[in-house]
């Protein structure tokens, strides 16, 4: 006969696996106290920045030059290579967000022919690339 502890452990593993499959892979990375600490740090940084901006605005009474300064040039993000954005969805997520994905596709490509961009069967692991066949 199987011991009660073994049955309880198997039941706990089974319930945990079911809950994990229902959350669609959402796992909190930070604890509540860590989030509070990070928010407090951001507030402190924002307060310090607002003070330094106010001091700079008081000191800079002269009009700004038409050309950007070296500091502003360095502050801009410049892309050196093309950026590719993608995502992976399982069949359940595809069905759940199908209407929103189709609307987004129509917004980006209004003149494209209306055709589904994923398999009708909702194959798992679809990544957006066309199949090699």
Curated annotation (Swiss-Prot):
One of its GO terms (cellular component) is extracellular region. InterPro entries: Motilin_assoc, Motilin_ghrelin, Promotilin. It comes from Oryctolagus cuniculus (Rabbit). PANTHER family: MOTILIN, PROMOTILIN. The gene is MLN. Residues 1-25 form the signal peptide. Plays an important role in the regulation of interdigestive gastrointestinal motility and indirectly causes rhythmic contraction of duodenal and colonic smooth muscle. Belongs to the motilin family. Its main location: secreted. One of its GO terms (molecular function) is motilin receptor binding. Keywords: Cleavage on pair of basic residues, Hormone, Secreted, Signal. Pfam families: Motilin_assoc (PF04643), Motilin_ghrelin (PF04644). This is Promotilin. It is found in: Secreted. Residues 118-133 have a biased composition (Low complexity). Residues 38-78, 105-133 are annotated as: Disordered.
């Amino acid at each position: 006969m199987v011991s009660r502890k073994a049955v309880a452990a198997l039941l706990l593993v089974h319930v945990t696996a079911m809950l994990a499959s229902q959350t669609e892979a959402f796992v909190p990375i930070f604890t509540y106290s860590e989030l509070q600490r990070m928010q407090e740090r951001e507030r402190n940084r924002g307060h310090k920045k607002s003070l330094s901006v106010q001091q700079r605005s008081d000191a800079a009474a002269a009009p700004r030059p038409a050309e950007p300064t070296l500091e502003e040039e360095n502050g801009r993000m410049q892309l050196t290579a093309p950026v590719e954005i993608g995502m992976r969805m399982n069949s359940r997520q595809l069905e759940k967000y199908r209407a929103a994905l189709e609307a987004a596709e129509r917004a980006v490509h209004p003149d494209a022919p209306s055709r589904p961009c994923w398999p009708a069967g909702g194959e798992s692991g679809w990544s957006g690339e066309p199949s090699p066949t």
